[in-house]
Amino acid sequence: MTKEAGELNALKNRFRTDYCGQLGLDGEGREVRLGGWVHRIRDHGGLVFIDLRDHTGICQLVVQPEREELFELAGRLHAESVITIEGRVVARSSETINPRLASGSIEVVVSAIGVESHARPLPFPVADEVQTSEELRLKYRFIDLRREKIHENIIFRSRISAAIRRYLEERDFIEIQTPILTSSSPEGARDFLVPSRLHPGKFYALPQAPQQFKQLLMVAGFPRYFQIAPCFRDEDARADRSPGEFYQLDMEMAFIEQDDLFEILEGMFRHLTDTMSKKRITRFPFPRISYREVMDSYGTDKPDLRIPLKIEDVTPMFTDSGFKVFASNTKPGCAVKALVLKGRGTESRLFYDKAEKRARELGSAGLAYIQFREEGPKGPIVKFMTEPELQAMKDQLTLETGDVVFFAAGKWEAACKIMGGMRTYFGDLFTLDPDELSFCWIVDFPMFEYNEDAKKVDFSHNPFSMPQGEMEALETMDPLDVLAYQYDIVCNGIELSSGAIRNHKPEIMYKAFEIAGYSREEVDLRFGHMIEAFKLGAPPHGGIAPGLDRLVMILRDEQNIREVIAFPMNQQAQDLMMAAPSEVTGAQLRELHIRLDLPEEEKK
């Protein structure tokens, strides 16, 4: 544990006068009291050395054999027992200085030991961070949290939360807590429901996000709102998503445009990175990429811009081609996409077989490619192409001998996504700088999309976003061409948040829902309280809600979100430490007027 991670102002009492990680040569000769956990014990031929650990770090204790009772007691201590000691700070000899410890220039010669708590043998060691199953780590999370790396992750999370609060309060944001018990919404993920004892048959829902409350705060006249809000969604776990609950930095501002919000967020992320991390932001202000452009060039709306590959559109090249597979995908709504790997045209057959396997996993029927070798172009589709077509391709894509180009063809979105998946797959060929933070904004999302299953126009993302062009756009444009004031912020391929400038004008909202097939009565039934509020004086407003868990993950170089949460659930949405979820008594259910109707397999 580093001094930086756990620096404290000493609280002097009968247990301690100082902290382990903060002792140094400036304390030489002082009598001190320390309290903490036994990290390691070593018997070195007549001297017992104890590594004592507290929140700030480790300090080496020395127990001398002349003090027989102390020496005997020290020899009986187990790792992770909690002790308090008294002793004198002495300088280490030059050959015994430990540069890995903040207190490595001193040690404490012990004059008294008090055992506050004997520790039984642990389910896994703390001092030696051996590989331990996640199930065991989560069951004994209070022990796992003693380990240095995860302990520092939780400290870092606390400090970044405090830094966010300071930053926003300096910019006139007001922290407001919104309700945890609210009403269920049919949109989005599944709700966690809470039965009401006072209102039998009715349920509260835990909020998936404080979305409606924060917009109503704008209507209430609060100009800038934020909170670090718990959110609850009954959804499956992923490496970057915790099941059940997560925390987000929820923000909303009145009388703003999109650029105003971008300026606030970019400044905050730069401040946090510069002051709390060794990482660096490569481009500032953050690049802004339209949804159409990001799909065309990166095949995903969550691009990792560190990967030095871009997708090229080669559709016009195949309009009159004799290669019918590609020619048939040059009509409107379709595309032929290409991805060039420089200098990889001589890879083994296994390289291409693995790439094709990945393409099939992404939904492609196969993976067409052309290698440009010394002896000429090679590959499964070369025989279908003419010399002029091959030369035109070399010219457009600036191909050289030794390069290889991969293709995907089909509906525009499908072709983009397949090439985007291959871009990420080939990203492993490059050494990406883990300290580089490549942020970008994805903007200009389409307001509507065509729902193939329902055979109708539907909202593509957030139905409450303001359409670009407002009412005029809705009344005069093809719905599929209308763009929304929606935006995502992405870093290194991870989406940190979505946000939008909200639609605060009821007539525009009614019109947008009408295009998506909803009557005015349906809109009033579902969202009447919001529309009623907007009819009583609503300012233009917009917001965003970056995930705190994901932000800490990125800044701490963690691949799994459970490493930055103090008490996470496992992937089956279970808290193994607290044995949740659990059964409740029949009396509790009767009080709530609930009768269980379990699936057959659960009854056994």
Curated annotation (Swiss-Prot):
* EC number of the protein: 6.1.1.23
Q: Which PROSITE patterns match?
A: AA_TRNA_LIGASE_II (PS50862)
Which reactions appear under catalytic activity for this entry? tRNA(Asx) + L-aspartate + ATP = L-aspartyl-tRNA(Asx) + AMP + diphosphate
Specify whether Aminoacyl-tRNA synthetase is a keyword of the entry: yes
Say which domain of life the source belongs to: Bacteria
Q: Where is this region: Aspartate?
A: 211-214
Q: Sum up the protein's function in the record's words.
A: Aspartyl-tRNA synthetase with relaxed tRNA specificity since it is able to aspartylate not only its cognate tRNA(Asp) but also tRNA(Asn). Reaction proceeds in two steps: L-aspartate is first activated by ATP to form Asp-AMP and then transferred to the acceptor end of tRNA(Asp/Asn).
Q: What is this protein called?
A: Aspartate--tRNA(Asp/Asn) ligase
Q: Which gene encodes it?
A: aspS
